[in-house]
A protein has these predicted regions:
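Hinge/lid segment of periplasmic solute-binding proteins
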Residues: 23-37, 101-157, 164, 187-190, ...
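Extracytoplasmic/periplasmic substrate-binding proteins
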Residues: 100, 108-109, 216-225, 241, ...
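Short, solvent-exposed loop/beta-turn-alpha elements that line the ligand-binding surface or hinge
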Residues: 33-37, 119-130, 136, 170-182, ...
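Helix-loop-helix "hinge/cap" segment bordering the ligand-binding cleft or interdomain interface
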Residues: 66, 73, 138-214, 224-264, ...
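Extracytoplasmic "Venus flytrap"/periplasmic binding protein-like
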Residues: 60-133, 137-147, 166, 171, ...
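Short, polar/charged alpha-helical segment
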Residues: 26-36, 51-71, 415, 433
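C-terminal lobe and pocket-closing loops
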Residues: 27-37, 287-301, 312-417, 447
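Immediate post-signal peptide segment of exported/extracytoplasmic ligand-binding proteins
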Residues: 22-44, 65-66, 141-143, 194-201, ...
């Protein structure tokens, strides 16, 4: 209960920390602008919501409305998992009349032909500012169906002081036979998490435990262990030795009580908030939490370390990656297209990405990577400089997307309950993965892959 109470204590402070980011309303560094006179136009939109996302809307949408005369009507704002379900209901009901949708490169392919092609709607000079590979991942069957706002990859955060404590070093070496330092491998991560744990007051680590979140975490451990989800012919292979080793890692941590008992209900807010309470030693998470972890509202401010994702036995690091994006839908009236393009411009432009990067989110514009690094160096902000150098290396050397196919989420819906069943002990690791592989084989056959 203590960790839950601590999480609740910091929720109100969270929005303040994420929101304390300045915007230069003159947009001096934007080479391309897309202002217009949109008086009388109201754009219906559905957006991802939550503490890491709302401050951008709160900052940028009022500026857009004041400068253009247009209005934004937010029909829905919720987590991506809940928004995904809502979009599918909308598609089934033929209710896709809104203009702008929060999207994600991992989700976009499953929604079919609901999108406007942004080529020709968004100026080429503006598109040229984005990282080419990110635009490639935003393209489906030759059509640019989404404009990327920020990218994600995870690295391992840790509480520095517990690693610097002389007594901890002595006890750890006596028990495990090697010097205490932030983990370099998945095995060390597991050993250290067990060493640190003192439930229910303190836990060695944690993980997101449901929906596509745990699917993605399992996926990157499979890769780190030298495996793959599918072979070249799209037959499932995740129930092999590498997949079993990956799932056993989650099971062992749960059985050792090295993670909170409620992790199978955790998503991103729970892991981020939990780490900031100072009750978790090691936390695999996105860069976008970085500024909050080190803020005055966090109980670990000034005591936060960061390393790249540890190596698996396959000689690879985890690096499950994707980008948060915005799409314009076919249901958007022709007379509203320029306004819709202008809105997603202000949510993805240089100023918006600098705004987000100051909190730790990873830019999708090439120039912003350099500009944010220069800004942090000039300020002498060693913490944020290290954040961007670490995550830049991960994006360049470790990052990989999930399969960008329409079946990704249906596949996730098959496998994640089986992962949970193994973690809870209701099935063995092999039983769970074999069951998921059998159902996945049917899914892929029905989809026409073989």
């Amino acid at each position: 209960m203590k960790i839950i109470k601590n999480i609740l204590l910091v929720i109100s402070a969270l929005s303040l920390s994420f929101g304390a980011l300045a915007v230069d309303t003159s947009f001096p560094n934007d080479k391309v602008t897309m202002w217009g006179d949109f008086g009388g136009i109201t754009l219906d939109v559905k957006l991802i919501g939550g503490a890491p996302y709302d401050p951008l809307y709160q900052s940028m949408i009022p500026i857009w409305e004041e400068r253009t005369g247009g209005k934004v009507k937010i029909l829905s704002k919720k987590s991506h998992f809940e928004l995904d379900k809502e979009i599918k209901v909308d598609i089934a009901a033929g209710n896709i009349s809104y203009c702008v949708l929060s999207n994600h490169t991992s989700f976009a392919t499953q929604y079919g032909d609901i999108y406007r092609d942004l080529n020709g709607i968004i100026p080429g000079d503006y598109l040229a500012e984005f990282v080419p590979l990110v635009l490639e991942h935003s393209t489906v069957e030759g059509r640019l169906v989404q404009l990327p706002q920020h990218s994600d990859v995870s690295n391992l955060w840790y509480i520095k002081s517990i690693y610097e404590d002389a007594d901890n070093k002595k006890r750890f070496k006596a028990e495990y036979g090697y010097d205490l330092a932030p983990p370099e491998t998945l095995d060390q991560w597991k050993e250290q998490a067990i060493f640190w744990s003192d439930p229910p007051n303190f836990y060695g680590t944690q993980y997101v435990g449901k929906e596509e979140a745990i699917t993605g975490r399992f996926y990157e451990l499979v890769i780190a262990e030298g495996g793959a989800l599918f072979d070249d012919g799209w037959h499932p292979t995740f129930n092999d030795e590498a997949g079993q080793s990956a799932l056993q890692w989650f099971v062992d941590l749960y059985n050792a009580k090295a993670v909170p008992a409620g992790v199978l209900n955790y998503l991103w807010d729970e892991t981020g908030l939990g780490f900031a309470t100072g009750t978790v030693a090691l936390n695999l998470d996105w860069g976008g939490w970085g500024a909050y972890f080190n803020s005055a509202d966090s109980k670990i401010s000034g005591d936060v370390g960061l390393i790249r994702f540890p190596m698996g036995s396959g000689g690879k690091r985890g690096g499950w990656s994707g980008s948060h994006t915005y799409s314009i839908l076919n249901g958007c009236p022709e007379e509203n297209l320029d306004a819709a393009a202008s809105l997603i411009w202000i949510l993805t432009n240089h100023e918006a990405q600098m705004h987000e990067a100051r909190g730790g989110k990873l830019p999708t514009m090439t120039r912003v990577w350099d500009d944010i690094a220069n800004e942090m160096d000039a300020e002498g902000n060693a913490f944020m400089s290290n954040l961007f150098s670490t995550f830049k290396a991960s994006m360049a050397e470790d990052a990989f997307t999930p399969p960008l196919i329409p079946e990704w989420i249906p596949f996730s819906n098959i496998i994640y309950p089986e992962l949970q069943a193994a973690i809870l002990g209701d099935k063995t690791v092999k039983e769970a993965l074999d069951a998921a592989a059998k159902e996945t084989d049917i899914l892929m056959q029905d989809a026409g892959y073989y």
